[in-house]
Regions:
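A glycine-rich (often HGG/GG-containing) alpha/beta subdomain
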Residues: 1-140
């Protein structure tokens, strides 16, 4: 399986809230480079899985957005890899800026269907489930 850490916008355009998923070996580390929890002394890597951490996405000293970040540890995630989900404001500018920051810190943009491919290859779903996800995506 590919060991790259990938990222992609997971929500439709035009919504009030957007979600960016990050998955791979370095997902938590890369997300931590651009995310600072609001609670002083708290670190994303120490957060409990399946919880939300409130904080800020930043570029150097500049705050880009207030966000919630959820943490999923391997193998208990959609892909079976360490993963984070960044819930931010849904404007195109914010979503693209967060993607650029993730890519600049070591992620690469996910190919269409790559999250599902990783889930299938990681034994998280069978072929019929993967095909159903592909059909659902193609129908929109």
């Amino acid at each position: 399986m590919n060991q790259d850490t990938i990222c992609a916008i997971a929500t439709a355009q035009g919504g009030a809230i957007g979600c960016i998923r990050v998955s791979g070996l370095d997902a938590i580390e890369i997300t931590s480079r651009i995310f600072t929890p609001a609670r002083k002394g708290k670190k994303l890597k120490d957060a409990k899985p399946y919880t939300l951490t409130f904080g800020h996405i930043h570029e150097e000293e500049n705050i880009i957005d207030e966000v919630l970040v959820s943490l999923f540890r391997a193998p208990h995630s959609y892909t079976g890899e360490d993963s984070t989900e960044i819930m931010c404001h849904g404007s195109s500018y914010i979503l693209q800026k967060v993607l650029q920051l993730l890519i600049g810190n070591g992620c690469r943009l996910a190919a269409p269907g790559e999250y599902t491919q990783r889930a299938f290859l990681g034994g998280k779903m069978d072929l019929s489930q993967a095909e159903a996800v592909a059909d659902l995506i193609a129908s929109t």
